[in-house]
């Protein structure tokens, strides 16, 4: 991953910003845009890609749409892009470092997207600075299942349950969607939404590990922490990515970033 291009809080970057980021890391071999499936992001990255192509930069775009919670939402047409984005960036970055060409890396990214599934939940909302009020209201004894990363409410509100019950419900939605089957190897990610203590995320992972073992799914690698957040929202998401030996080799390749660091 050579460049990240954020917009304002919960706002897509502009085409000019994306084009500037693209040009700043162009080494002549082409650029892969990895875009979460939100309407503004997709539209602006499409415009930026066209601008970059007029300047002779080869562009490939892969849209991540791994969220099983919704087919359509306020911010997206089709499934939202969430946790699989992190896994795709790491794996594709390793492929680029290895010397794969642009088409190979884009095809690899599409495979990761096809084989990854995610779902999130929240106990609290978040407050967008420009609004100054929570994006939705929720009682202490309630929870939202299927929330988004821009403070969107979930697809279902229900009474608060135990960690085991919550993870059981979410993991079954994730597992049944691909579907994952006994014997599959996966990378599992438990991602905090910004306001959940790390100790609780490890508790969630323990429940996910138990469920995967019961289902016959082998967790080959795991990632636990705050990677795609929604300001101060208390909650988490789970992501499963089906992998083979080739993908695991790319995942295990050395990485040194503020959030991921191993093999160096």
Predicted regions and their residues:
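Short glycine-rich or small-residue beta-strand-to-loop segments that form or flank ligand, phosphate
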Residues: 1-4, 30-39, 46-49, 60-63, ...
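Glycine-rich oxoanion-binding loops at beta->alpha junctions
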Residues: 2-29, 175
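Short, acidic/small-residue loops that bind anionic groups at enzyme active sites
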Residues: 4-9, 53-78, 214-219
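Extended, charge-rich low-complexity interaction segments
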Residues: 37-42, 90-103, 243-264
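Short Gly/Thr/Asp-enriched flexible loops that form oxyanion-binding sites at enzyme active sites
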Residues: 42-56, 75, 200-206
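Short alpha-helices
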Residues: 64-104, 108-115
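Mixed-charge interfacial surface used for oligomerization/domain docking
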Residues: 98-203
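C-terminal non-catalytic interaction/assembly regions of soluble proteins
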Residues: 173-264
């Amino acid at each position: 991953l050579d460049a990240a291009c954020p917009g304002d809080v919960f706002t897509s970057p502009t085409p000019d910003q994306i084009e500037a980021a693209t040009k700043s890391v162009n080494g002549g071999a082409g650029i892969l845009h990895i875009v979460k499936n939100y309407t503004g992001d997709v539209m602006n990255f499409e415009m930026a890609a066209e601008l970059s192509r007029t300047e002779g930069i080869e562009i490939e775009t892969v849209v991540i749409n791994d969220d099983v919670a919704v087919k359509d939402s306020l911010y997206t047409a089709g499934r939202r892009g969430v946790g699989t984005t992190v896994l795709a960036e790491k794996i594709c970055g390793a492929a680029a470092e290895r010397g794969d060409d642009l088409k190979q890396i884009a095809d690899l990214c599409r495979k990761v997207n096809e084989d990854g599934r995610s779902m999130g939940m929240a106990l609290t909302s978040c407050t967008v600075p420009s609004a100054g009020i929570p994006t939705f209201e929720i009682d202490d004894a309630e929870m939202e299942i299927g929330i988004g990363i821009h403070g969107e409410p979930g697809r279902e509100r229900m009474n608060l349950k135990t960690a085991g019950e919550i993870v059981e419900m979410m993991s079954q939605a994730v597992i049944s969607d691909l579907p994952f089957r006994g014997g599959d190897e996966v990378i599992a990610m438990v991602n905090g939404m910004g306001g959940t203590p790390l100790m609780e995320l490890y508790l969630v992972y323990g429940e996910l590990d138990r469920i995967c073992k019961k289902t016959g799914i082998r967790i080959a690698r795991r990632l636990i922490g705050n990677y795609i957040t929604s300001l101060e929202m208390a909650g988490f998401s789970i992501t499963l990515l089906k992998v083979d030996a080739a993908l695991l080799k790319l995942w295990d390749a050395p990485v040194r970033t503020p959030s991921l660091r191993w093999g160096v």
